[in-house]
Amino acid sequence: MKFAIESISKNSGRLGQLRIKDGGPEFKTPLLLQTTKGGSIPWLSADVFETQVSRKPQVLQFTLSTMEQMTEALTHWNSGGGRGLSDYVGLPGHLNILLLRDPCETTPSGGNDRDILPLFTRRGKESLSAERYMEIVASFKPDMYEGLCDADTNLESAKKRVQKSVDRTEKFMHYIYEHRGKVNSTLLAPIVGGYNTFARTQSIKHAREQPAGSYGGYIFEGFHTNGLSATTLDTSELLPIVEHCVKQLEEDKPRILPGAYTPLTILELIQQGIDVFDTSYAYCASLNFKALTFSFVQDAVEHVPFLDITDEAIKEDFNPPLSNCNCLTCQKHTRAYLHHLYKTNELLGPILLMVHNLYHYMDFFEKIRESVAKDTLPQLTELVRNQNGKTQVDYSIAANTKVISKATMEKGFAAAAV
């Protein structure tokens, strides 16, 4: 993996070019990974994603917690001449990264053992050792993969739990570093330690002590428990820790921060020097019946961050979900129609909502890269912060009380309503 910095600004972060595989496409950073569940973009077929969301190659974010059951099949697939993980899930032409935990769902706490990491899958809790993890990585053959780490920490974690997460991660990574040569994939060094600067420094020091070429980048873990918790993080606590960590890292490696961070938090993290994020925020919004409507284009109109499609007030609103959006949903359909799909249990509902949210979020990142290049990210941050209003906009996502379960949501909107 090769990472080259095009420009660095004190006010706007950094702009870079990331090439994951020799001969593969180059990706501009700040980069947005495409979050998947079970190897698929939630609610979207490969054809819909590639024709209605993005026609360009993307980096798919796979998670072991949602794909562990595919290990045996992938072993046979790759040993029989299979063309890799993306081809296996029906998304050829895209590169991929393998993470441990699903950033879209809350990860249960506990279950930690000295030599074992708990992995919460669709079959329940699995015990994952460093040896077993490397066997799985060898079977999956991802383009990039996260080092095994204990990320069971958040803002409320006790000092003892934080220290254990660092010590256990070092033990796991000692084995990973020794055996990484058996896997033809780029390793990402995990940086853990919760909100403790000393613990984070210890984690960084352990990674930087490794021989040159041991890993291709850094991935930050342990700030939250995934799911909606990432949308409510206190940035006054988060940003100083990130700043502390970034100062200790070399410039020529990408920095990845998975999780459903809000648009405003992402902009502030980019100013700190983070390079790669994911689309789990767009998924969480879709799951909770919200269309993203925040503006990132300068105008004089006050905007709101979401459109709640369960709101009875839009049942006769024949405007598009977002007037200046060029996605299929906004070009062909109305707010009233989305509300109708929600009320009538139509599977088309979550499909159209996810198409819009992904399209809008990817457009947002295009604007971010443009702003970083022009060193105007502070102005974009101010717009996203207030949306031309007088107070800061709340981008946090609360679980919709009308949602019963994710399983019913996948069958349509109304099936999930009370």
Curated annotation (Swiss-Prot):
GO terms for molecular function: metal ion binding; tRNA-guanosine(34) queuine transglycosylase activity. Pfam families: TGT. It is found in: Cytoplasm. GO terms for cellular component: cytoplasm. Keywords: Cytoplasm, Metal-binding, tRNA processing, Zinc. Its cofactor is Zn(2+). This is Queuine tRNA-ribosyltransferase accessory subunit 2.
